[in-house]
Amino acid sequence: MSQLKVNSIIPRSGVPVGASGGGIVQVVSTRKTDRFTTTSTSFVDITNFQVTITPFSTSNKILIMCCFGQAGTRIATLDHGNAIRVLKNGSIDNNLNADADGTRQRHCYKGVGWSYNADHMPGGVGFCGLDDPSTTSALTYKVQVQCQSSSYAFHMNRPPDNGTGTNIYENATVSHLIAMEVAG
């Protein structure tokens, strides 16, 4: 006679029988290694920087985490920056962006201008948020950016002067966008 002995069986929903929510059901991610630059004063997609996830349950949440290897706007003063928002299936209406407040735009992150040398760019910029989509249909989350002024470009995974030397500030970086389904 065969026996199967286990401490617990975790169902597809990510939560053992008798337990409450919080288990990770699935993880979907994208890794962006190419360099991106824009001077757009309207929101534009960051190319090849989106994830699609299909929740198993309407009660589950989606945790979005984004980390830019390096990103920002290089200027001599700190009065020009950039705005970042996350779209879900093409809509700004999700729990990842700010609530509507008069005529103010809805962002999840506001980047400042960095007054470093032209070849320097800060790194480790990121954000996260928990969305409550209440669906089992596919969800596509993508990141968009907008420049405050077209004179001051937003750069991602590269220094502003796009140097290719061997100095640390000229090195290539990687950015990640991660979606995790969390059991409700």
Across the structure, where does each feature detected by a protein language model lie?
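Terminal beta-strand-rich extracellular "head" domains
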Residues: R31, T37, S42, P55-K61, ...
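Solvent-exposed, flexible loop/coil residues
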Residues: S13, V28, S40, T47, ...
